[in-house]
From Swiss-Prot:
Entry GO terms, CC: cytosolic small ribosomal subunit
Protein name per UniProt: Small ribosomal subunit protein uS15
InterPro entries linked: Ribosomal_uS15, Ribosomal_uS15_arc_euk, Ribosomal_uS15_N, uS15_NS1_RNA-bd_sf
GO BP annotations listed: translation
Region (Disordered): 1-22
Keywords tagged on the record: Ribonucleoprotein, Ribosomal protein
Amino acid sequence: MNKRKEKGKSHSKRPVRNTPPRWVPFGPEEIKALIVELSKKGYGPSMIGIILRDQFGVPLVKPIVGKKLVKIMEEQGVAPPIPEDLFHLMKRAVRVRAHLAEHPKDKHSARGLMEIESKIRRLVKYYKRVGKLPPDWKYDPERARLLVQQYSALFESGA
């Protein structure tokens, strides 16, 4: 069952080839250094990928370095404390909760909040299974609000 994925199928295609392109001017060590540098500036993983693509001409990190971008960040000790997709869902849930505090009769937003929080719980279950979150980690709306306040600078479009 495809949950909430009926829209947004249009996107650019990933390069088919798994070998690094010959025209990329950077080697694996230089790309690792760029990733660490950009992470220390406050950029999140997806923003680092966009910057590497648009400003440095690196289409994909994995074929060149041999590891995914987040894996490199984890090895260097600059990875975000919680996965980026989970953080952004929690941020949306916090925003919708704040909206519902002002507009309690907004039933459409209440339903949207239920769907967002269901998706958060599914992601949490997955991240616990793969070991990215501790086994005792639980989603709590108040804790999510505090986490969003604390880590929002890490996942913004940069410092």
